[in-house]
Amino acid sequence: RSTPSNSSAASDVYKRQDFNMANYDFPVDGVGPWDMGVGSYLSEGRATMDSGKDPRERLLSLFGRANYSYRDRYMVSASFRREGSSKFGANNRWGNFWALSGGWRISNETFLRDVRWVNDLKVRLGYGVTGNNGFGNGYTTRMYKANDMWPTNGIWQPGYGSVRNVNPDLKWEEKSELNFGLDFSLFDDRLWGKFDIYHRKVDDMLYEVNAPMPPMVHDTVMKNIGSLENKGWEFELGGDIVRSKNFRYTSSLRLSHNKSKIKRLGDDGYFLDQVTFPSPGNPGTAVRLQNDVEIGQFFVYKYAGLDEDGKWMIYDKNNEIVPAVDGTKSNLVAENKHFVGNAIPKVILSWDHTFRYKNWDLSVFLRSWLDYDVFSQVNMYYGLANDSQLNVLKSAYTRNRNIKDEKILCDYWIDDASFLKIDAINLGYTLDLKRWTRYIQSAKIYLTIRDVAVFTDYNGINPEVDINGLNPGFEYVNNTASMYPQTTRFTLGVQLTF
């Protein structure tokens, strides 16, 4: 095999995106950025548009990229992007984002030329910075909305008012990532895989935080509030395990691990309390975001057992056992809360198997999340016998039968939710129809079964909750996926090839 000594490529791109809305027949005049929903033109059978729509967004991008390769052994790539977004204030609309990466294909070196069982071996290293403007319009410039009530001289009057609090100092959220990777293919491409380890950091995080009223009109405002660190690795291994004339078996396994931590969230001592529970019976918030706290931890009281009357006992801030409520004194105060558990799985696994025998094919897809916790609002709200109006769970009279108290926000409701799931099974048989008709080459009859079975010791309804964002790990009361078990679905079909 011969390869060119040198190869290079370069490109540059200019990109512009505009988003506009128009309406007319407004009932009033003299208001700046129009409230799209007030004009009647779009509501008279031509189109519908809710009040408060964002009228305009604009994104401009200048992009350049260059690649260089020497004998398909050493590869370098560089890119630069300058982007401007109308979502930010006048002084912060433009951001510069770049990336640099390199690769070394070791398998093309002379010292591996005679190693027959190595088909491909490559290492990669890259670093890059990207920007995020993923929020709605109108956070930096005043927008108005009709038909709301606003206080005027102590009297609530209908009219125009601001859609949200504005922050003219908003700027791009930036994510930087350092990545090292290894790719390999061995034994005539019968075994392949890759490994990646990464370190990501998000600076100037965009997040909507609580705002004081007054002086602000609304109770939240968008801010750049801090930085987030993200570390992890990903591993994939695949193999063409059995290959014969009539039978073939291939499989691939994917493993990943990720950990996130808030490095900075405003000044020291600043925090954000998150995840408010439903009313009635709202016991407070279950997550606290602050400096040097791992994402996924719960901020709740630590369960210390029950007293002889079935009342809650907790650990206070000094790890001493105290009653949750002692007469008229309540120990359910923020300083007695603890950071406990973690809702981010230590390992996320997926494993697929494919079998082919003559005209038959069978595939099985497995998934697993290992060593993570879930806070079940469902158990907390519906799992106590004395909440007779709400109680619908058998556990109120079995697992929780000794609790004679009202619900409190404690780690009693947190369970290890590790699971192994048979996600899907596909079985098919292909009929060769070419000798019967010239119009149809083949027909494949298939049966697909989804959500086949879940193996877990989790005490809630569904261990597979949302594990993304800053508040992962909750089985919510008002979420359909949490309130009802997953159903197994069967699909029988025919696929024709013409």
Language model: regions and residue ranges:
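Predominantly transmembrane beta-strands of Gram-negative outer membrane beta-barrel pores used
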Residues: 12, 99-101, 352-354, 363-365
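Conserved SET/PR-domain catalytic core that frames the SAM/AdoMet-binding pocket
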Residues: 252, 335, 345-359, 423-428
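Short, exposed "boundary/linker" segments that immediately precede the start
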Residues: 1-2
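Surface-exposed, extracytoplasmic segments of Gram-negative outer-membrane nutrient-acquisition systems
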Residues: 153-163, 201-225, 259-344, 352, ...
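A common structural microfeature
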Residues: 359-361, 488
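Extracellular/periplasmic, surface-exposed regions of secreted and cell-surface proteins
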Residues: 8-286, 414-498
